Regions:
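Enzyme catalytic cores with a strong preference for nitrogen-chemistry domains
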Residues: 1-417
Length: 417
């Protein structure tokens, strides 16, 4: 599996803010949009070449008409089809889930200097308390907090975390409120030697591996955890660790060494009866930050049964640049590809609720504390893109291999001649 990738600059992402033009991404995904851009430009370029070299005027009338019609069809047909799908799309009637997106607005550059973790916990819980004030029903509610909100989670021993204990005690006051939040978590391993290339030594016989995780907690001891698997190269993970970790050690360990899951897993928003027994599970896919840029990755959540998607992120590192706005808009494409509603929590913004058409139903402002309340629809249907995967990408990869083989065979043939 490729460990270095950067899908941020896919041409198909260019339509993230004009979702009415790309509703057919539910079939072909974002790479289908890249193919559309490529084909449209190629057809226009071909017409310009025909006109500039005079060959256009040597075509007969039928050839001219066919060439012009083909170019127009490539350019306009997908957009017209998409507009028809956009205005004809109806939100499925059925179950919904109440959600609250929390935006604590904590500057990551001063996160550990200006505020203690306990103070940050108070900020978040005050926001949640405000959102829950006046709550009378006992149906499930999902509260979502941003990526890496805390850094004191030890996998397999959550009781060591003051944050976990504080959240659990708070949630005991609110029946069926589930809190999804991000955490830097750690796995301690006892071993005489390094258990893996990515493990760092704590002391003799003790090693630690780090994760960028999402935790789902309620007022019980039954916590769920998911480790981010699409990690940012260098910042979070060292690619091809058998080779690069040795180089990183020589440089003093400047690269990240987070360990992710090999396969995605779901988290459940749970409804419990008065005795605490689970009576209903709502399976959710939680994309942690950079994961939301990967179409196939998000589709995998839905293949595994996710009825809705959540995105937790901390986009404050970029400052007031186009990055955080682009990151938000890409979530709209994931909604179209999977036809799933999305709730998005971003530390300093922009948090949002996005429907299955890709429209941003509601959102917060940038760099200010906020609480966003709403509902998301739940769905069990799978789109063609989810069911069949990224066929455009696979087809292009196959064609690239065939083209390479053709070039090699052709070159060898010329040498023999």
């Amino acid at each position: 599996m490729a460990q270095i990738s950067w899908p941020w600059l896919l041409l198909g992402n260019a339509f993230a803010r004009t979702v009415s033009l790309v509703q057919w991404y539910e079939w072909l995904g974002t790479l289908g949009g890249s193919l559309w851009v490529w084909a449209s430009n190629l057809s226009v370029f071909a017409l310009m070449v025909f006109l500039s070299d005079g060959s256009w005027f040597r075509f007969n009338a039928k050839a001219r008409f066919a060439s012009a019609a083909a170019a127009l069809l490539i350019f306009f047909a997908p957009a017209i089809l998409s507009m028809s799908m956009y205005y004809g799309h109806e939100q499925q009637e059925g179950d919904t889930l109440k959600v609250v997106a929390l935006q604590p607005n904590i500057d990551p550059y001063h996160k550990f200097q200006a505020l203690s973790q306990s103070q940050q916990n108070v900020i978040l819980l005050e926001q949640l308390k405000t959102a829950l004030s006046g709550r009378t029903d006992t149906s499930a509610l999902l509260a979502v907090a941003p990526e890496t909100f805390t850094n004191d989670i030890v996998t397999g021993d959550y009781e060591r975390s003051k944050t976990y204990r504080r959240f659990r005690e708070f949630l005991k006051q609110y029946h069926n409120v589930n809190l999804l939040f991000g955490a830097s978590s750690y796995s301690y391993i006892e071993s005489a030697g390094a258990p893996s290339y990515t493990a760092r030594k704590v002391s003799d016989g003790l090693w630690v591996e780090s994760h960028n995780s999402a935790l789902m907690v309620d007022g019980t001891d039954d916590a769920q955890i998911y480790h981010k698997s699409k990690l940012v190269v260098a910042v979070e993970m060292t690619p091809y660790p058998a080779f690069f970790c040795k180089i990183d050690d020589l440089l003093g360990g400047v690269m990240g060494r987070c360990v992710g899951q090999k396969e995605v897993s779901l988290l459940s928003c749970r409804t419990r009866d008065a005795e605490g027994k689970v009576v209903e599970d709502v399976p959710l896919g939680c994309a942690v930050c950079y994961e939301s840029v990967y179409p196939e990755h998000c589709a995998e959540y839905v293949r595994k049964g996710a009825k809705a998607l959540a995105i937790i992120t901390n986009d404050a590192w970029w400052g007031n640049t186009p990055g955080y706005r682009q990151h938000l808009s890409y979530a709209s494409l994931r909604a179209i590809e999977t036809r799933r509603d999305i709730v998005r929590s971003a530390n300093t913004g922009i948090s949002a609720i996005i429907d299955s058409r890709g429209d941003i139903v509601s959102k917060t402002a940038w760099w200010e504390p906020a609480v966003l309340e709403g509902e998301i629809h739940l769905s069990e249907k799978q789109t063609f893109f989810v069911a069949q995967g990224d066929i455009v990408g696979r087809l292009c990869a196959f064609m690239a291999v065939m083209l390479l083989l053709f070039c090699i065979v052709r070159k060898l043939s010329f040498r023999q001649e």
